[in-house]
Every structure is written in structure tokens, then in C-alpha cells.
């Protein structure tokens, strides 16, 4: 396009030309029409930012509530764990004492059984010695009797013994 007034100050119909009046007019039109759009864009952006802030605040409050609930549950679980730990230790101590008492009772029983076995073996050894001594004494007495007794003395001893048995039988 050609300027109508070459070399003078005027309005240029070429909107892409860079004179001050054209720029002012373009800026004025942009500001007039763009003001509403820009204002709407800024208001929308402001509303989105405010909504995001409110949502963030709500999420933060929800997170704080959940954190408090989690802390309360943690305290409760820790208290239960402490209670179980204390009860567990008490149960372990009880079981330990029961085991010690059981072992002590078993040891006492083993000691008693050992003493009974020793006493039994001593009695058996004493009985064996007594039987051996008695048998040797009887063999010695029998040997003495056999060497001392003659036939007549033997018959008199048998007769006296039979008489004793006869009188014992008569008394019953």
C-alpha cells in the first residue's frame, strides 16, 4: 500500500508499518479488547491458583489428621508391644523357674534312687558275706561234728531231736 500523504504526518493504513500512531492505535485496540480477555485469563489463573492452594491446605490438613491418627496407632501398638514384652519376660521367668524346679525335683529323685540302689547293693553284699560266712561255719561245724561224732553219739542225738519234735507236736 502506498501512503496517501507522503512525507507528512498522518495515519498509515499499513498496519505493519512502524510509526508511533499506528503502534499507539494497535496497542490501544489490543488493550481495549485484550483487557477483558487478559482480565478473564488472569481471573481464571487466580481462581485456579486459589483452588490449588485450598486443595493443598485441605490435603495438608488431611495429611496432618492422618499423621496424628498414625501416631496414635503407633503409640497404641508400642504400648501393646511393651505389654507383650513385659508379659513375655514374666512368662519366660515363670517357665525358667518351673524348669529349674522340675530339674531340681528330678535331681532329688535321681539322688534318692541312687541312694536306694547303693543301700540295696550294700545289703545284698552283706547278705552274700553273711551267707558265705554261715556256709563256711556250717561246713566247719559239720566237719567238726563228723570227726567228733561216732555212731552211738549220732544215734542218741537223732533220738533226742526226734523226742523234741514229738513233744512240740503234742503241745500243738
Curated annotation (Swiss-Prot):
Listed GO MF terms: ATP binding; proton-transporting ATP synthase activity, rotational mechanism
Topology with respect to the bilayer: Single-pass membrane protein
Keywords recorded for this protein, A-Z: ATP synthesis, ATP-binding, CF(0), Chloroplast, Hydrogen ion transport, Ion transport, Membrane, Nucleotide-binding, Plastid, Thylakoid, Transmembrane, Transmembrane helix, Transport
Membrane spanning residue stretches: 15-37
Pfam families registered for this protein in UniProt: ATP-synt_B (PF00430)
Localization per record: Plastid, Chloroplast thylakoid membrane
Major site of localization recorded for this protein: plastid
InterPro entries: ATP_synth_b/b'su_bac/chlpt (IPR002146)
Single GO cellular component term: proton-transporting ATP synthase complex
Further remarks about this protein from its record: In plastids the F-type ATPase is also known as CF(1)CF(0).
Family annotation (PANTHER family): ATP SYNTHASE SUBUNIT B, CHLOROPLASTIC (PTHR34264:SF3)
Family, per entry: Belongs to the ATPase B chain family.
Function, as annotated: F(1)F(0) ATP synthase produces ATP from ADP in the presence of a proton or sodium gradient. F-type ATPases consist of two structural domains, F(1) containing the extramembraneous catalytic core and F(0) containing the membrane proton channel, linked together by a central stalk and a peripheral stalk. During catalysis, ATP synthesis in the catalytic domain of F(1) is coupled via a rotary mechanism of the central stalk subunits to proton translocation.
Subunit structure of this chain's protein: F-type ATPases have 2 components, F(1) - the catalytic core - and F(0) - the membrane proton channel. F(1) has five subunits: alpha(3), beta(3), gamma(1), delta(1), epsilon(1). F(0) has four main subunits: a(1), b(1), b'(1) and c(10-14). The alpha and beta chains form an alternating ring which encloses part of the gamma chain. F(1) is attached to F(0) by a central stalk formed by the gamma and epsilon chains, while a peripheral stalk is formed by the delta, b and b' chains.
Protein name as catalogued: ATP synthase subunit b, chloroplastic
Organism field: Pisum sativum (Garden pea)
Amino acid at each position: 500500500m502506498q501512503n496517501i500523504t507522503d512525507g507528512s504526518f498522518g495515519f498509515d493504513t499499513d498496519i505493519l508499518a512502524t510509526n508511533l500512531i499506528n503502534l499507539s492505535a494497535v496497542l490501544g485496540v489490543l488493550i481495549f479488547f485484550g483487557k477483558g480477555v487478559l482480565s478473564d485469563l488472569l481471573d481464571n489463573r487466580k481462581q485456579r491458583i486459589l483452588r490449588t492452594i485450598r486443595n493443598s491446605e485441605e490435603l495438608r490438613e488431611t495429611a496432618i489428621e492422618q499423621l496424628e491418627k498414625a501416631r496414635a496407632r503407633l503409640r497404641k501398638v508400642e504400648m501393646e508391644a511393651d505389654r507383650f514384652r513385659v508379659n513375655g519376660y514374666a512368662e519366660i521367668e515363670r517357665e525358667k523357674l518351673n524348669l529349674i524346679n522340675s530339674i531340681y525335683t528330678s535331681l532329688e529323685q535321681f539322688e534318692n534312687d541312687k541312694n536306694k540302689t547303693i543301700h540295696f547293693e550294700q545289703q545284698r553284699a552283706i547278705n552274700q558275706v553273711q551267707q558265705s560266712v554261715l556256709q563256711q561255719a556250717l561246713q566247719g561245724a559239720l566237719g567238726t561234728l563228723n570227726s567228733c561224732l561216732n555212731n552211738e553219739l549220732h544215734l542218741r542225738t537223732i533220738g533226742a531231736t526226734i523226742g523234741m519234735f514229738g513233744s512240740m507236736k503234742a503241745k500243738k
